[in-house]
């Protein structure tokens, strides 16, 4: 008996040693399942590497780790992501964005009428569902699922180029409030892109996984997701590795675009007061918007940022500079106050070829000014937070962990507003832009059987869950 036990022990040790040596010296297996964050404004793809337990968010051919959720249709081709952004000004009626807002969703006529007016492309009502009308060589209609499939195909190709092998399986995230039809429509979009979806995971749950909360000893988790166009607040209850979304609230018309718009309106007024005209050329408006975005990003790290823009003055429209209290004329507001139209890429008037001169507009924007322009919007973030606490029958002191998701949560004043409300710092240990895709990639690794083994997140369906929107 002792001899048999010795042999058995030696065999176990041999297996353990072989496993250790294999883990140390053999090439790591390539991930076979990708994780996808199909966002409203940006989307991204990541993989979980067996052995190391690391997540890699995969860049595109130009090094971007996320791509704009935009698709442009032309006579020659269909362009996706940053290539689509370049066409947004010259081809706005055929450049589709915000498709995620419409995928699998049934609208009332009143709801759809309100949505139609927000976009430069044609939004059609097909029995309460949305289709988009685009004109390339001919006028065609495309569904939100098809637009989503083009984005997913691009992400799939990025993953295949990085991994050096075909990819067929994926895990994908969706908003927690998506119903079964919206989830199935998202799966349909993935199928059109040649992907089999192994699992659909809620975005707040994915974010919590990225922060490691599926393995942590916490119970009440509040996820604040503030991106380019929307705010979503979710209250999660966690027991072991199981997550229950207990309450949701948000604002579908609050995000980084709105903060940019406040600064852009301020700049238009400054230009009018200084030079007596308002920029109307679409390429100049586009450059101004890009400059505003860069200033906003710089202000997350610095107390001030420099903005400069080369502007064309059409002499026949130029007036004497105005005093600082002069209001921008109503007829000049069309381009400056084009609120949230064309996803922040601007629209202009026809170009003129004669009687022109150029001026270099330069100004310094302080963080204090940016915060002052947006303070009322920053305070609106607290409204859905208070709502989910009310629906969850919790005091703010009972929240164990506050998790930040989305690029707009980088803004220092927003973090301060949240910190002051809860009386403690939010968890900022994960890049908020990549929190969801990181969590989805971890789940993809789990579903792909990667090692070291991770604790999977089990989501408990909540059939009574409804999202309260403050738009």
Curated annotation (Swiss-Prot):
GO terms for cellular component: endoplasmic reticulum. PROSITE patterns: HSP70_1 (PS00297), HSP70_2 (PS00329), HSP70_3 (PS01036). The gene is HSPA13. Residues 1-22 form the signal peptide. InterPro entries: ATPase_NBD, Heat_shock_70_CS, Hsp_70_fam, HSPA13. It comes from Pongo abelii. Pfam families: HSP70 (PF00012). It is found in: Microsome; Endoplasmic reticulum. Keywords: ATP-binding, Endoplasmic reticulum, Microsome, Nucleotide-binding, Signal. Has peptide-independent ATPase activity. PANTHER family: HEAT SHOCK PROTEIN 70KDA (PTHR19375). One of its GO terms (molecular function) is ATP binding. Residues 314-352 are annotated as: Disordered. Binds UBQLN2. The keyword ATP-binding applies. Its main location: other. Belongs to the heat shock protein 70 family. Gene3D superfamilies: 3.30.30.30, 3.30.420.40, Actin, Chain A, domain 4. Residues 315-341 have a biased composition (Basic and acidic residues). This is Heat shock 70 kDa protein 13.
